[in-house]
């Protein structure tokens, strides 16, 4: 009986095809010499060897290269062997496909994480219907260029629109977000709120005319709205009005009221550190009054009441901090309480007005050897000086922005987006002042 481990299975003969036998896993594979061509198989039977399926086998003759191990896969099959180059090309194509797919998944994950970082409550925490239109690029990448709802089918409440401006996620997407909302403000609100949007647009026009002419300070805002707004006048005809010949008790102009509110704290703070001199306080707030803009100046907290510090503030607040010399910085550091010992360090490092705002806490404590308290004092005073100069250099704001700065809001003025767009693209103050007007009507009745 023939041992099956030593049996030879011939795949093809000269004129007859046979079914190949399964090789035994306990021994080396054996291939008939008739299968291979004369160019591949050596004529000498002692030099014939087939690479093992468990690894590359060495040839008995070292001078004879192994053609099967480099050009063909080891093993048997009916199909012709496939070159390794084609296999590697196909594998590279598969790897590129999987890498691109993984990259797309990682990008979508990154977008989601970034949106969650801006707004931890998610997109539902906004409380408004989000639009992924061409003008508002705030939505995910897959939804850009689409609108979830047509503009005519949106029901938007005034309170929602009021909180829209200071929203941080909308602030991060695009600065002109309220521009597109101001153009789409004529929306359907149901049967009750059909006329207020038109009256709001008329109040926008009245504000624009008031800003351009600036010759109507005697009329109160309430009377102006009643004149410009026939719809609201019709609605309020049910309530008797007594203000025919008597002057109203409402302030003459909210913007005038803003100027008075604005000058009061400046005069109070000026009395705190002018020590009988009227010039320093007037010059400090000269650039921040109603003429140059309504920015409320960042008040410099007086750390000591010495005359030297007052004189230094008089010079430093009027000049640009970037124009300071090394001696100016030396005098500035020496005037701060508790920092006079480190003034020479600033002079040794040649710190002038351009490099002073660039110093960080690491520079002050690590490089220059300051303690934590003086370093924080210096950083606070420098940032306040830079903030004052920023307020002086910015142009004047429109009327509605002044009112937005004067009103106590939940969001800080830095998040107010009303200064980025025109007067006609901002919700009118009628929405913001409607509860105040109703209270005044009740008091008048």
UniProtKB/Swiss-Prot annotation:
Any one GO biological process: negative regulation of gene expression, epigenetic
State how changing residue 328 to V affects the protein, per the record: Decreased repression of CRX-controlled gene expression
Residue ranges of the region described as Disordered: 193-282, 425-445
Domain SAM as annotated: residue spans:
324-378
UniProt cross-references to InterPro entries, sorted A to Z: PcG_chromatin_remod_factors, SAM, SAM/pointed_sf
* Subcellular location, principal: nucleus
Question: Basic and acidic residues bias: where?
Answer: 227-244, 434-445
Query: What cellular-component terms does GO give this entry?
Result: cytoplasm; nucleus; PRC1 complex
| Any one Pfam family match given in the protein's UniProt record, by short name | SAM_1
Task: Describe what happens without this gene.
Answer: Samd7 knockout mice show decreased expression of multiple rod genes in the retina, ectopic expression of nonrod genes including S-opsin in rod photoreceptor cells and impaired rod photoreceptor sensitivity. Show an up-regulation and down-regulation of cone and rod genes, respectively in the retina. Double Samd7 and Samd11 knockout mice show shortened and disorganized photoreceptor outer segments, reduced light sensitivity and delayed signal transmission from rods to rod bipolar cells at low flash luminescence.
Query: One MF term in GO for this entry?
Result: DNA-binding transcription repressor activity, RNA polymerase II-specific
Expression sites (tissue/organ): Expressed in the retina and the pineal gland. In the retina, it is predominantly expressed in the outer nuclear layer and developing rod photoreceptors.
Region ranges (Required for localization to nuclear polycomb bodies): 98-172
Induction line: Transcriptionally regulated by CRX.
Question: What is the protein's quaternary organization?
Answer: Monomer, homodimer and homooligomer. Component of a Polycomb group (PcG) multiprotein PRC1-like complex. Interacts with PHC2 and NR2E3. Interacts with RNF1 in a PHC2-dependent manner. Interacts with SAMD11.
What PANTHER family does UniProt report for this protein, alphabetically?
Answer: POLYCOMB GROUP PROTEIN, STERILE ALPHA MOTIF DOMAIN-CONTAINING PROTEIN 7
According to UniProt, the name of this protein is: Sterile alpha motif domain-containing protein 7
Task: Give the originating organism.
Answer: Mus musculus (Mouse)
